[in-house]
């Protein structure tokens, strides 16, 4: 994909918090031949003004309606959940939409966004940066050659994000209007009630399931959609979760996330095993820059000898590559590799994982 073969995309950024300051705005500035950022938006006036000044953005606003009235092609939504209303407004205003994960809480929200996207004819892309990592793409090619996958596991040991953010210049403001905070709480609660219906009260203690989003979209991209949630356990005061998934070929996947806040050592792996091959990805935290995802491949060659290899990984960021892919989708009509339609499957799986915990029984899909 040649950087200068397509027109520049004018994109507005909604949400000026940590992920915007650490990843999206620095990356958009580096991609100045491909993107222009004429406006940012945050409900915190101080946050919006600071980020606009720091990243040399000409204009800042506190109301997304003012942003959507501006001369922009697309919006990048990375503000605090929920993002559904903002996404729908953007589509209705004729803008392409990049929306950070998870895209929403309920299937009803996902369907509303997808409907607005289709009516607008615009691109809707989920912020699934891990599938754009060069190491992930290399791993996918290896996995596609595996005949009979037996076992899969993802392990996600998550320290406090504050440990990672301490190495970056991230500024926060406490001028958020109380009414905005109350509206967010009510909208989030309504979405959870929509997602879980009669199980809503019990689902209130299961929010960590949404923290599996990186693991789940990576699994879906690599292996497809599971046929069942066999079981789910949540423990340690809702800071740890393990769920077992079943795939159509009978393979099992064990997905675990544990919040271990104090020790600064982020661990996240995706491991795929068959009789003759093993593929293991090791990811860095999303709050890092210029840190590569690592790939290990083990197998048996044509001579019957075992091999172990760690391929050299190109120095490309998944965060940057997903933005370039968005531009390609906008300019050339390329189907998105992380479309809102695909992202809906991930929300459905999170809901089923939660239901398996609440009911203490399998959920067949």
Which residues make up each language-model segment?
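C-terminal helix-rich "cap/oligomerization" subdomain common to oxidoreductases
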Residues: 2-4, 74-76, 122, 248, ...
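A contiguous active-site-proximal alpha/beta segment in oxidoreductase catalytic domains
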Residues: 105-181
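C-terminal glycine/acidic-rich active-site capping loop/insertion
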Residues: 171-175, 179-199, 271-338, 363
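N-terminal Rossmann-like dinucleotide-binding module
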Residues: 2-55
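Beta-loop-alpha module in the N-terminal Rossmann-like domain of NAD(P)-dependent dehydrogenases
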Residues: 55-116
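Oxidoreductase and adenylate-handling cofactor-binding alpha/beta cores
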Residues: 132-153, 166-169, 192-202, 208-233, ...
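Short active-site oxyanion
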Residues: 35-39, 73-75, 124, 206
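Contiguous beta-strand/loop segments that form the cofactor/metal-binding neighborhood of enzyme cores
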Residues: 199-287, 316-334, 351, 364
């Amino acid at each position: 994909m040649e950087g200068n073969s397509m027109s520049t995309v004018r994109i507005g950024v909604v949400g000026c918090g940590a992920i915007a300051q650490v990843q999206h705005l620095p990356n958009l500035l580096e991609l100045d031949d491909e993107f222009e950022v004429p406006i940012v938006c945050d409900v915190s006036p101080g946050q919006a003004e600071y980020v606009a000044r720091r990243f040399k953005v000409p204009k800042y606003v506190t109301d997304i309606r003012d942003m959507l009235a501006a001369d922009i092609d697309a919006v990048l939504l990375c503000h605090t959940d929920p993002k559904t209303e903002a996404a729908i407004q953007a589509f209705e205003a004729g803008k392409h939409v990049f929306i950070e994960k998870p895209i929403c809480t309920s299937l009803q929200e996902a369907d509303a966004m997808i409907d607005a996207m289709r009516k607008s004819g615009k691109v809707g892309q989920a912020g699934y940066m891990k599938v754009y990592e060069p190491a992930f793409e290399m791993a996918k090619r290896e996995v596609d050659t595996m005949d009979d996958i037996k076992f899969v596991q993802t392990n996600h040991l998550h320290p406090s994000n504050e440990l990672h953010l301490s190495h970056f210049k991230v500024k926060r403001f406490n001028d958020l209007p109380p009414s905005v905070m109350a509206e967010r709480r009510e909208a989030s609660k309504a979405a959870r009630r929509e997602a879980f219906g009669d199980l809503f009260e019990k689902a209130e203690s299961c929010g960590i399931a949404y923290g599996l989003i990186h693991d789940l979209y990576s699994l879906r991209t690599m292996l497809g959609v599971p046929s069942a949630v066999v079981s789910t356990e949540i423990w340690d005061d809702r800071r740890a979760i393990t769920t077992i998934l079943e795939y159509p070929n009978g393979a099992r996947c064990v997905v675990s996330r544990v919040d271990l806040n104090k020790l600064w050592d982020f661990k996240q792996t995706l491991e795929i095993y068959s009789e003759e091959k093993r593929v293991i990805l090791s990811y860095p935290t999303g709050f890092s820059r210029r840190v590569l995802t690592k790939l290990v491949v083990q197998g048996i060659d044509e001579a019957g000898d075992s091999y172990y290899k760690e391929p050299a990984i190109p120095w490309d960021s998944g965060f940057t590559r997903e933005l370039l892919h968005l531009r390609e989708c906008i300019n050339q009509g390329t189907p998105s590799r992380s479309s809102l339609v695909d992202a809906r499957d991930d929300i459905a799986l999170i809901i089923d994982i939660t239901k398996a915990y609440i009911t203490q029984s399998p959920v067949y899909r």
